[in-house]
């Protein structure tokens, strides 16, 4: 590993601005940025359809899907496991070659044996709901209530927590799991 390489991983609550903070940080540092790009890369590696990968990455298998993909005699990895395994390899490969900012996908854990800075972004629920509502297209915003968006935010947080804890055996969002925790409502996206 080159000593001058900068690797930053960003975990985040849904709606806390992780993608935007990561993109801006990478731009400021003049390094590569990876987030949604993992979908295209995982599609190439797994052969799954892009929509399927997008809908199922950063998800942990549940009891039903786990039972469907494991047999009495031989374990068959679930599609979730296959996507995660490919993203694991991609994250390690990218980090071994270049400076970068990686958002999500338990990258902090995947790179725990390499020098990097791990950040977790969070914000109060009300602010995250407002941020996600503001990002909606006008035609979608007309159909979405803040209460419905709050349900989506809670569901995404639950999904991310479950994924992180399933694949890492660490606590998602806990102080001990990250180098730096930032409340984006306090710092703002630009200040994070």
What are these regions (language model features)?
Residues 10-26:
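Glycine-rich phosphate-binding P-loop
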Residues 32-44:
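Short beta-strand-centered segment that lines the nucleotide-binding/catalytic pocket of NTP-utilizing
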Residues 43-99:
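ATP-dependent small-molecule kinase phosphotransfer cores
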């Amino acid at each position: 590993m080159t000593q001058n390489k900068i690797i930053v991983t960003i975990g985040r609550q849904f709606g806390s601005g992780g993608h935007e903070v990561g993109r801006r940080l990478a731009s400021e540092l003049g390094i590569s940025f990876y987030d949604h790009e993992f979908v295209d890369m995982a599609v190439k590696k797994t052969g799954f359809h892009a929509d399927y990968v997008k809908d199922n990455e950063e998800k942990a298998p549940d009891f039903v899907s786990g039972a469907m993909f494991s047999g009495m005699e031989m374990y068959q990895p679930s599609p979730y496991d296959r996507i995660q395994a490919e993203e694991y390899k991609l994250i390690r490969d990218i980090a071994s070659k270049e400076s970068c900012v990686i958002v999500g996908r338990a990258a902090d854990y995947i790179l725990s044996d390499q020098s990097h800075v791990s950040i977790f972004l969070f914000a109060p629920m009300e602010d995250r709901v407002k941020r996600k509502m503001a990002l909606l297209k006008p035609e979608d915003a007309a159909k979405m209530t803040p209460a419905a968006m709050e349900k989506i935010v809670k569901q995404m947080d639950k999904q991310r927590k479950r994924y992180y804890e399933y694949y890492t055996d660490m606590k998602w969002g806990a102080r001990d799991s990250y180098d730096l925790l930032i409340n984006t409502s306090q710092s703002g996206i630009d200040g994070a």
